[in-house]
From Swiss-Prot:
Organism: Rhodopseudomonas palustris (strain HaA2)
Keywords: Ribonucleoprotein, Ribosomal protein, RNA-binding, rRNA-binding
Identification of the protein by name: Large ribosomal subunit protein uL23
InterPro entries: Nucleotide-bd_a/b_plait_sf, Ribosomal_uL23-like, Ribosomal_uL23/eL15/eS24_sf, Ribosomal_uL23_CS
Family: Belongs to the universal ribosomal protein uL23 family.
GO cellular component, one term: ribosome
Xref: NCBIfam families: PRK05738.1-3, PRK05738.1-5, PRK05738.2-4
Summary of the function given for this chain in its UniProt record: One of the early assembly proteins it binds 23S rRNA. One of the proteins that surrounds the polypeptide exit tunnel on the outside of the ribosome. Forms the main docking site for trigger factor binding to the ribosome.
Length: 99
């Protein structure tokens, strides 16, 4: 059994399960919430090692935190970095069943 570097678990925070992410899964794409300092090569390596799939490309985006009012005080939600991972043909990841 091959060993998995524990740092890969720090790069991938969680899968994103939204309506838009579910529609993207029909086109061989998976969306993950990733660490804010993670680079595309790190994300690609982590997904390939953790899920045993081949990654075609990685696109990243940062969703800026919204300003919200809670009980009369204003605050800001945290920024979230997401990675849209496109898989090679024939490879699939089912994030709805859990890790």
């Amino acid at each position: 059994m091959k060993s998995i570097d524990p740092r890969h678990y720090d790069v991938i925070v969680s899968p994103v399960v939204t309506e838009k992410a579910t529609m993207a899964s029909e086109h061989n794409k998976v969306v993950f919430k990733v660490q804010s300092g993670a680079t595309k090569p790190q994300i690609k390596e982590a997904v390939e090692k953790l899920f045993d799939v081949k990654v075609k490309s990685v696109n990243t985006l940062v969703r800026k935190g919204k300003s919200k009012s809670f009980r009369g005080t204003f605050g800001t939600q945290s920024d979230v970095k997401r990675a849209v991972v496109t898989l090679e043909e024939g490879h699939r990841i089912d994030v709805t069943t859990g890790l």
